[in-house]
Amino acid sequence: KQGFARVLDEDEMTAETMKKEIFALYENKEKYVVAMNQIGCGVSKFEENYINRFKRTDDYNQGIFFYIKDIKTNEIWSATDDNNCEQFTVQFMPDRNQFEKTEEEIKTKFKVTVDANEPVEIRRLEIQNKTQEEKILEVTSYFEPVLSRKEQDYAHQAFNNLFLVYGYDEENDYLTVKRKKRESHQKELYLIAKMQTNSEKIGETEYEIDRAKFTGRNNFGIPKAVQNSTPLSKKIGLTTEGIV
């Protein structure tokens, strides 16, 4: 495998260019795979099970996304989308995928790696403030968990979602998702999603598992909760449209 890098000029950042079906694939010994394209859309898989929802035929971006919001200016951008930014660099390398961009004088470096021996992926976001003023930033991650084979999800998405059970570990500050068995011979699958920071954090971690509350109805762009800085509900329960 070889990595490559190139800087996209502003006139190259078209929807057609950025949605090329060029995927970087990484697989570890535990058959954990991450596949991504040039704007961060894609899927993570464990064996034959999709971690997040992804369907190439859908006309909106799908994957595991990180949104950054400048509280003072209300500017919002994704760590992996071009978003008409000042500079955008993508690198697909043997050991990681890396996205670098500069937006509103905030430079971000987003790295995606897979542990060599365990079914674990790490998404690391580094933020550099290039201004002389203090910045308060909101960082929000978002994806739709699946934990099943894609055929099951494609056949009946709402029914497939009914087998997901959500939880939150307050002591260790992480969300859990369990896929219940449909048949006795099947294994139960578990997912843990955790965010942590080395910088100063204001307030407690917030979370939401209801897609409609987070994104808003029929909204496939920046989630409404991110746009409005709406406090997330921090409630665990049943949902037919779950998110993490």
Segments and roles (model prediction):
Residues 1-244:
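Anionic coordination/interaction segments
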